[in-house]
Each structure stands twice: as C-alpha cells, then as structure tokens.
Amino acid sequence: MMDFVLLEKALLGLFIATIVAITISKLRGKKLKLPPGPIPVPVFGNWLQVGDDLNQRNLVDYAKKFGDLFMLRMGQRNLVVVSSPELAKDVLHTQGVEFGSRTRNVVFDIFTGKGQDMVFTVYSEHWRKMRRIMTVPFFTNKVVQQYRFGWEDEAARVVEDVKANPEAATNGIVLRNRLQLLMYNNMYRIMFDRRFESVDDPLFLKLKALNGERSRLAQSFEYHFGDFIPILRPFLRGYLKLCQEIKDKRLKLFKDYFVDERKKLESIKSVDNNSLKCAIDHIIEAQQKGEINEDNVLYIVENINVAAIETTLWSIEWGIAELVNNPEIQKKLRHELDTVLGAGVQICEPDVQKLPYLQAVIKETLRYRMAIPLLVPHMNLHDAKLAGYDIPAESKILVNAWWLANNPAHWNKPDEFRPERFLEEESKVEANGNDFKYIPFGVGRRSCPGIILALPILGIVIGRLVQNFELLPPPGQSKIDTAEKGGQFSLQILKHSTIVCKPRSL
C-alpha cells in the first residue's frame, strides 16, 4: 500500500514538474547558445534517448554526430562532453579555474561527506588546503625515495609467493588477487607504516570487502534515474541507505583500526623529531593545528583507498593482460631487462629510467586501457563560455581522455597495442600531459597527483613479473579475455583471468 501511495505521489509530481518545465522554457527570456546535441524532452531531457551507460565509446559515437563539443540534458543535469585536445586544453588548462570544480551526485555526496575530501570537493580554499596537506606526505619525490624499498620488497614477496604455489606454473592462478594485496601494502606502508601479511588476513579481507562494495555502489548506473530526476529520488531510499551503511562501516574501520591505533602508538613512545613519519602523522598534525577536522582526516584515508589503490591495480592488471596476449612484446621487454640490468638482477625504482621499452609498455597500457577514460568529472560553478558556446553553471564536464588517446586522427593504428609508438613517432609524448592528446592523469589544477607514485610502482611490478616468469594464458587457450567493464568513470577488466606464471631459470 505504501509503495502504491509513493508511486502515485511521484507520478503526480512528475506530471506537475513536466508542466512547470514546459512553462518555464517558454517564458524564459534569456536565449543561450548551447553546444549541439540531441533534442531534449521536458523533464527527462536526453536520458530516455541515450540511456544510463555513458561510457567512453558511446560518447565517441555522439561526438562523431554532433562534434567535439556537445551537450546532453540528463533529466535536470547538463552533461557537456569534450572530445578534442584543443578543447581539453581549454577546460583543463586555459580555463582551469572556471572548470576546476567537481560535480557530485547523490551517492558521491554520501561517500565524500558532501565534499569533505580532496578529490570530489569544489574548487575552493578547502580544496587548496586539502591538496597542500596531502602533497607532502604522499605526492613528492622524497616519498618515492623513502618508500620505494618497501615497494620493491612487496614485489619480491609476490614473486616468492607465486613461485611457492605449484598451481601457478601449471594450470595458472588469478594473479590479480595477490597483486591486490601488494597495492594495499604499498599504500598502507605510506599511510600507516602497516602491512597485511597475507591475502587471508582477516582485517585485509574486511577492508577490501567494504572498499569493493563502496566501488560497486558508486560506479553503478542503477541510481541514475534518481540523480537525474530528483522527483524520483524517493525510490532510491533503499540504495542510499545501503550506501550510508557502507560509508559508516568504512570510516569506522579506518578510525578504529588505523587512525586511532597510530595515535595510541605515538602517545606511548618518545618520537625522535628526526625520525621518519608516515603520512597519517602529517595529516593528524594538520588536524591538531586546527587546519582540518577528524572527518577530513578520514575522508583523506577514503580517497587513498579508492583513488590510489584501485586505479593503479587496474592498470597493473591491464598491463599484464596485454603482455600475456602479446608474447612478442613480453619477450622484447624481458630482453631489455636482461640486457640492461643483467640476468637475475632484479629491477629497482631507479632502474625504470634506464629502461625505455618498459616505459613505453607502461605508457601504451595507460593509452590503450586507460583506467579513468573520462577523467574525474569537472564542473563550472558559474556560467561559462567554451568554444563560443554558453555552458550553464554547474554543468558536468566530461573530457573523453580515452578518445583523445585512441583517435585515429591523432594516432597511427590506435587499435593496436604497440609500445614502439612511444619510441618512434610519439617519442616526445609523456604521461604527465605535455601533449593534450595523451592525458591519462589529467592536466592542470585537478590533475591526479598520484602519477608520481603510480609510474614507478607500475615499472617495479611489471618489471619483476616479466623478469621472473613467462606469463601465459591457461592451458588450452591462446589468449585471455580482455572484455571491458565500465563504471561511472572507470575502465576495468571484466574477468580477473587465470594466468600461468612459468618461473624462469635465472
């Protein structure tokens, strides 16, 4: 009975909203020059035409029809899509302040405390403060040099564990499971000076389960209808309640098992002022100085759990998959490692710069299988102009970075996984965004600061695996499945494949 009453009220509200929208559109005096796009209908906009799955490939189809700048009206939200290097430069660099905010939806409002974090907050003094507080303990070359030995140790442990598993060399294993532990340990060493001993560690299992559920809920397209059309939001109550429960459990776990434990440790020992601090020590100091509050501390931990751990893991998994499916490239990379470093000499962080083909493999992985293909969405707080068009305030701006890096107008045979391109015709193109046709980490004020950690970690992990194993598809298969799984703005491998890891005699 209650559901029927709710439905009746929603339909009545929807009818009234339709009439109001039509009336307002006719009475509105200001005529805007909006970017081209499909003709919207009242209330629903283009939502019923284009559907929920606005992945990078679907958006390319619309760009081919409407141009490199087009607009979709998704219910009550404006979605502006940028599909050329020139327009990307305008949004991310030239007008970086105007388009430097973040848009959030009803689910991300829950998971970020309405922007109390760094990644999803609007461009403001709060963002500048959070970025500054996070940079020193996480995103500097000093951090890389301090923790690269830990990354090398974690990679060595992966090699040992895989070699100790007889199944790995015969039928194969889901290597991703062990690499997930590696990435958690890499970042938890930096954050808390902590690591998990095994994939069966109860705390690790609880942590990754909660993080996984958070990602599933946030990346899903299931809740679009209630986000696009607020009058339908009552139908999301169950979904949003689950999001709130997961958010509360995660923040409590971060606080009880990691942040508070670190505070206790610091309170019972005499800390040498010259001793090395982990990242959370710096963050807690900022809280003690009154620069941020306890919630901000926990949302910083939440950002690292998602933005640093998950995205790098996706890229490692994609890189390995492409090496398995391209054995000649794998062989060529192994030859470089053996020749430059010497047979049996394990790659370390400083060695990555001596290995141009390894760097090319990493760049090509980030181009061909971009983990965040539409970047993290941008937003303009106020009315803005772009390419002569009016962009209404609070529009969601998507830069199709995947298409910039896979457009045949700018790349030679982009549908081929070919690292050699970065040693030949694209030798001057770097992952830091020096060329706007290749911006896997974004560019400008809201670019991903994690690039300074991701590139060396990718080099160490992929390098060690190729040095120590011949990576093969399972028996009876010539290739592993690389079907894609998209999300709100993520690109993951759909199936975590079984990979045969045949040890090399070094």
Curated annotation (Swiss-Prot):
One of its GO terms (biological process) is lignin metabolic process. It comes from the Eukaryota. One of its GO terms (cellular component) is membrane. Disulfide bonds: none annotated. InterPro entries: Cyt_P450, Cyt_P450_CS, Cyt_P450_E_grp-I, Cyt_P450_sf. (E)-cinnamate binds at R214, S215, R216, L217, A218, Q219, A307. GO terms for molecular function: heme binding; iron ion binding; trans-cinnamate 4-monooxygenase activity. It is a single-pass membrane protein. PROSITE patterns: CYTOCHROME_P450. Heme binds at C448. Its EC number is 1.14.14.91. It catalyses: (E)-cinnamate + reduced [NADPH--hemoprotein reductase] + O2 = (E)-4-coumarate + oxidized [NADPH--hemoprotein reductase] + H2O + H(+). Its cofactor is heme. PANTHER family: TRANS-CINNAMATE 4-MONOOXYGENASE. Catalyzes the first oxidative step of the phenylpropanoid pathway in higher plants by transforming trans-cinnamate into p-coumarate. The compounds formed by this pathway are essential components for lignification, pollination, and defense against ultraviolet light, predators and pathogens. Belongs to the cytochrome P450 family. This is Trans-cinnamate 4-monooxygenase. It comes from Petroselinum crispum. The gene is CYP73A10.
